Every structure is written in structure tokens, then in C-alpha cells.
UniProtKB/Swiss-Prot annotation:
The glycine cleavage system catalyzes the degradation of glycine. The H protein shuttles the methylamine group of glycine from the P protein to the T protein. Keywords: Lipoyl. This is Glycine cleavage system H protein. Residues 22-104 form the Lipoyl-binding domain. HAMAP family: GcvH. The lineage of its organism: Bacteria, Pseudomonadati, Bacteroidota, Bacteroidia, Bacteroidales. Binds 1 lipoyl cofactor covalently. It comes from Parabacteroides distasonis (strain ATCC 8503 / DSM 20701 / CIP 104284 / JCM 5825 / NCTC 11152). Its cofactor is (R)-lipoate.
Length: 126
């Protein structure tokens, strides 16, 4: 499994990649593997400000539906439109083309509370 060191992670298996004033959010390689084949991504929070740990959408696999949680507080600037026709991108490229949302950070200090790649690996090894 792949856990890029330049990302931060949550205990709920989301990742965040900060690029200047914006950040991209997705689910981890571990999470997509546990969910199995992703068939639908439902995110209706574009344009809204969502608090840390609140639900920003759902992701549907063949066997289950899971909530998606905000890793930090922020405004949802964009939803990955490619996932509408190709939700399998989450399975194929969880940290690249399979990103879920682009956000503007409300409180960058919340990033310090997230897990490093090393700490996330320890979490899922339990």
C-alpha cells in the first residue's frame, strides 16, 4: 500500500494535500481497498463551508456506503467532476486523479492535529 509522506491523514481514512491556499482531499489507498469497487461518489457540499470532522459527502461501493469526513474546516471550492462518470478513479489513483474535493482552509492550524504517513500506517496496522 502507498502512503505519500507529503500528505496528512485522518483516523477516518481521508488524506489532505495542501497546495498554497487550497487543499485537495480524498480517501486513502487503504480505505479504497477496504471498500472495494467504488460505484458512486455523492458530494453536494460545493460552495459550502464544512467544519472539521463533519460529513461532506458519501462514497458508495458495491457492498456498502460510507460517509466522507472533512479532515479540516474549510469551504468546498470544487468537486472532482471526473468521478461522476468514472468513480473507479478512486480505486485506480486514490492520491491523484481520484481526489474528491478541493477546499480553502478556514484554520490551517488544524493540519497539525492530523496524522503523518508513518502514524497513519501504525493506525491501520493495529
Amino acid at each position: 500500500m502507498n502512503f505519500p509522506a507529503d500528505l496528512k491523514y485522518t483516523k477516518d481514512h481521508e488524506w489532505i494535500r495542501v497546495e498554497g491556499d487550497v487543499a485537495y482531499v480524498g480517501i486513502t489507498d487503504y480505505a479504497q481497498g477496504e471498500l472495494g469497487e467504488i460505484v458512486y461518489v455523492d458530494i453536494t457540499t460545493e460552495g459550502e463551508t464544512v467544519a472539521k470532522e463533519e460529513v461532506f459527502g458519501t462514497i458508495e461501493a458495491v457492498k456498502t456506503v460510507s460517509d466522507l469526513f472533512m479532515p479540516v474546516s474549510g469551504e468546498v471550492l470544487e468537486v472532482n467532476a471526473e468521478l461522476e462518470d468514472a468513480p473507479e478513479l478512486v480505486n485506480e489513483d486514490a492520491y491523484g486523479k481520484g481526489w474528491l474535493i478541493k477546499i480553502s482552509l478556514t484554520d490551517a492550524s488544524e493540519l497539525e492535529e492530523l496524522l503523518s504517513a508513518e502514524d497513519y500506517q501504525k493506525l491501520i496496522a493495529k
